[in-house]
A protein has these predicted regions:
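Boundary/entry segment of secreted carbohydrate-active catalytic domains
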Residues: 2-30
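Short, acidic/polar
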Residues: 25-43, 145-157, 250-259, 316-324, ...
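Carbohydrate-binding surfaces of carbohydrate-active enzymes
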Residues: 2-5, 11-13, 209-210, 214-254, ...
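A cross-domain feature marking catalytic cores of carbohydrate-active enzymes
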Residues: 19-21, 53-55, 93-99, 170, ...
């Protein structure tokens, strides 16, 4: 597509190289020039270079600035030289500024730093828990202190260098108690605004603590708004971007993006956790970030050059290639991150970046302007994560991820929806909307959901969904009681439970063996609790819906087999309490689960839980998904439309097992393990997949064709089957794109 004349450069297909110089002594940059960095980006196929204007020690990488000392080992004028060379090569340069870590400034103004309630300086770096007497290397400066004016000057200086964009990297101000700021500036401002002191201890029962928690987000968004305005006033066509790091920092920054999206041109989804997360993590984070940022904005996501945190040596070329492709298939722009030490010591895997960037350029036509195929959507509520999950966000997030991954494994088109987008115009795009323990739902969202289902939409809800309203305050009733045909009577709190079938012929139980379904999981910590908190709990409901399955009780608190005290107990008998219900509301259908179905699939991964999720989607959906892929679950599929085209990405994750070992926690009288419980490997080899079949509902198959752009646009074998076009992919090695379009 050609929107060259109207769109900002950052809304067009981009390939990004981030080159980080994070070295106390700077030995890795001796002799390194800005022009060399621009040429490196160009040679690898990138059209954007991201570099520091100022590092975490406070040193600047350009000459003549006033916001910090020049880096002592800088050759030439790195940022300006990169900009000049980039102009010649067609490489845009984005400057990283306003890093909240600044050691030089801290040494001059220690009282500008963030400090926690104990008076400890809040750190960006990782320090062993019991290390004493540590001097901060990357102290975090406070966004309420005079640092807020200092970073504005940083932005002004960077723009004067001629850069094409401003990137706020590691712009951190957390609400979490250990990392939340209690400096004099924060205390003073908060008291002026609210009339009382900051609560010193976390107490979610206290409205003052909840207000303080939410206030910290407003501080960050206020700074984003000020800096965005500054950038757009001085250089309207410059990019303004924020690093959200969506799977890190307890996921809190997703709320910053959701609530501050009006002040962001783009978001960088840093994915440094990718090597100890499942294959597909980067794809998941891109889709999550796109939901938070809103339609039509740009998400760039990173694949590190290195494995885990071993920054001085590269990962496997396969791992680098597949990680970059994970971004592409999710509709993001690929971003490769390399550190100066690994560039100095080992460049052997750089060609992996070049290969994927060349692929990306080859398929630009099919990426530009493509939009996701809307079918199923999983709602992500940042307010629920914060106010329900609190200091255990995984108790909510695992439920979300379980539904998402189950549908990904079944090749069902699935997106995320941000809480603020629970409005009619967004909901009606989808055949199915999933509320995975979405506890906190304000009235306007409830009204939109009711309207959506009444109009024929399909709704899946679990556990405590809609039991809290405005401000996430308990209502002791479902806000969606009428829609779900369920009344909330309480919570059954047991360490283990079961679900048994009441109507085995119901579509929600299709393909499910008529055996008890275990609810609950053991604790992998096992220091204070035997089981994962709340996992076996059920809402107690009075239901006018069809009761498809019921809650059953265990015979004891824990099991006596194998590992006595850790194993689950045997089944005792059914209670008659509903566990799964099905109903209609207006023209739509609903399925409700009194327990946390998604959390079970995320933690345990048994096929019964996945089949229950798939059945629910098929049951409540208005229509079948318009595309079906027959391939192993290790093949990641993503679907986009582009005018009359349907574009399908196939990414093969059929690797060696990445996570080799995991601990199961300690017990009384512990003994050493047999080997380390923390072994994480990169993918080394991909197993090709044969005979993948794709079915697309097109109406008249004779009018459509399928081609493979990465195979020189070769035509794929197709046949008609009623209204379905059936496409055969003989062999999937690492990555393929399939384009279905009208003939002629």
């Amino acid at each position: 597509m050609n929107h060259e004349d109207s769109r900002p450069w950052f809304q067009k297909p981009t390939r990004v190289l981030q080159f980080n110089i994070e070295d106390r002594y700077g030995s890795s940059i001796e002799g390194l020039t800005g022009a060399e960095l621009a040429r490196l980006a160009h040679d690898l196929g990138a059209n954007v270079l991201v570099i520091f204007a100022r590092d975490g020690w406070g040193r600047i990488f350009y000459r003549g600035g006033e916001v910090g000392p020049e880096h002592g080992k800088m050759v030439g004028d790195i940022v300006r030289d990169a900009v000049r060379e980039g102009r010649k090569l067609g490489v845009r340069v984005v400057a990283m500024v306003a890093h909240t870590a600044n050691r030089w400034l801290y040494k001059k103004h220690a009282n500008w730093a963030q400090v926690n309630a104990r008076g400890e300086t809040i750190l960006l770096e990782h320090v062993p828990y019991h290390e004493e007497g540590y001097e901060p290397e990357w102290p975090q400066m406070c966004l309420n202190s005079p640092f807020k004016d200092f970073i504005k000057e940083e932005v002004r200086e960077a723009l004067e260098l001629g850069v094409d964009g401003i990137f706020l990297d590691s712009f951190r101000y957390q609400p979490d108690y250990e990392r939340s700021c209690y400096c004099e500036w924060c205390r003073r401002r908060f008291k002026e605004e609210y009339g009382y002191d900051m609560p010193e201890k976390p107490d979610w029962r206290d409205s003052r603590w909840r207000e303080l928690w939410d206030w910290r987000y407003r501080v960050v968004i206020e700074r984003l708004r000020e800096l965005y305005s500054l950038v757009k006033t001085r250089k309207p066509d410059a990019l303004f971007m924020y690093n959200s790091h969506p799977g890190g920092w307890a996921g809190r920054t997703n709320r910053v993006v959701e609530e501050g999206r009006e002040y962001l041109d783009a978001v960088f989804a840093e994915c440094s956790e990718a090597d100890h997360q499942p294959p597909g993590f980067i794809t998941e984070m891109v889709k999550l970030t796109k939901a938070m940022l809103g339609e039509g904005k740009t998400v760039w996501a990173s694949r590190n050059y290195f494995h885990l945190y071993r920054t001085v040596v590269p990962s496997t070329p396969l791992n680098i290639r597949q990680g970059l492709r994970e971004t592409i298939i999710a509709g993001g722009s690929p971003w490769a991150l390399i550190f100066s030490n690994s560039y100095a010591q080992d460049r052997t895997a750089l060609n992996a970046i070049k290969e994927v960037f060349e692929e990306h350029k080859q398929i630009e036509e099919y990426l530009d302007g493509a939009v996701p195929l809307h079918y199923a959507a999983v709602v992500v509520s940042n307010v629920t994560r914060d106010h329900y999950g609190r200091d255990k966000p995984e108790h909510y997030v695992d439920e979300v991820r379980g539904f998402y991954h189950a549908l990904k494994h079944e090749h069902v088109p699935v997106d995320f929806i941000a809480g603020r987008d629970l409005v009619a115009d967004v909901l009606r795009k989808y055949s199915v909307v999933i509320l995975p323990n979405t506890v906190c739902l304000p009235n306007h969202a409830l009204n939109s959901i009711r309207e959506y289902v009444r109009g024929g939409g399909g709704l899946i809800a679990t556990y405590l969904t809609s039991t809290c309203g405005e401000g996430c305050i308990e209502k002791y009733e479902f806000g969606l009681a009428e829609t779900l045909k369920a009344r909330f009577r309480g919570v059954l709190k047991l360490p283990w439970t079961y679900v048994t079938q009441a109507r085995h012929d119901h579509p929600l139980l299709e393909g499910i063996p008529q055996t008890p379904i275990l609810v609950g999981d053991m604790s992998y910590d096992f220091t204070r609790e035997r089981v994962a908190p709340h996992m076996a709990w059920h809402t107690i409901i009075k239901s006018d819906a069809d009761v498809v399955a019921q809650v059953a009780l265990p015979a004891s608190e824990w099991g006596f087999e194998y590992t006595l005290g850790r194993s689950p107990p045997a089944l005792a008998g059914a209670t008659g309490l509903p566990a799964i219900t099905a109903s209609t509301y207006g023209d739509g259908k609903t399925a409700y689960y009194t327990w946390q179905l998604g959390r079970h699939y995320w933690r345990v991964g048994l096929p019964t839980y996945r089949r229950l999720i798939l059945n629910a989607v098929k049951y409540v959906a208005r229509v079948d998904a318009p595309v079906k892929v027959q391939a192993p679950e290790t093949v990641s599929t993503e679907y986009f439309t582009q005018g009359d085209r349907l574009i399908i990405h196939l990414l093969n994750h059929t690797y060696n097992q990445r996570i080799q070992a995991i601990g199961i926690g300690k017990t009384k009288q512990p003994i050493p393990g047999y080997s380390t419980s923390a072994a994480v490997h990169p993918p080394r080899e991909v197993i090709p997949i044969k005979d993948i079949t794709i079915k697309v509902r097109v109406g008249d198959p004779s009018k459509f064709t399928a081609l493979a752009p990465l195979k020189n646009g070769s035509t794929l074998q197709t046949r008609g089957n009623g209204e379905w076009l059936v496409i055969s992919v003989d062999t999937l090695k690492e990555y393929e794109v399939v384009v279905i379009e009208p003939k002629g």
